[in-house]
């Protein structure tokens, strides 16, 4: 983790974020009928773009590979859990592909624009 003055806050927010994604991924599903087919793939990709941007904001660039590895394992674990669930959820290899696509897009964005964002936020907070 970067040397962050508000590290406990960033860690707590990170735990909350991961728990929220886990809950939303495993909770019983209520999809409105008007959503397009396979719209959930867009949701998967967007969620993982956000997760990568979040976590690459908290670690040094040489550690980005750890973020990628952890999120791939997280996504695979969720799909395995969904496949084992007896109600309303099922594992889907296309969801895994959407997750990995989101991870790639998020990594590209972090590499050129948003990496280390937490340091910038803390610098801004300390100016106030």
Model-derived segments and their meaning:
Residues 1-94, 100, 104-128:
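Bulky hydrophobic segments
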């Amino acid at each position: 983790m970067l040397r962050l003055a508000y590290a406990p806050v960033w860690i707590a927010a990170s735990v909350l974020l991961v728990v929220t994604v886990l809950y939303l991924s495993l909770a019983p599903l209520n999809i409105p009928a008007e959503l397009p087919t396979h719209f959930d793939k867009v949701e998967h990709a967007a969620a993982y773009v956000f997760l990568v941007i979040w976590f690459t904001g908290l670690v040094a660039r040489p550690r980005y590979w750890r973020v990628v590895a952890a999120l791939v394992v997280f996504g695979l674990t969720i799909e395995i859990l969904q496949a084992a669930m007896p109600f309303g959820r099922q594992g889907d290899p296309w969801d895994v592909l959407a997750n990995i696509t989101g991870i790639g897009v998020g990594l590209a964005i972090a590499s050129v624009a948003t990496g280390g964002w937490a340091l910038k936020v803390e610098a801004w907070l300390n100016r106030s």
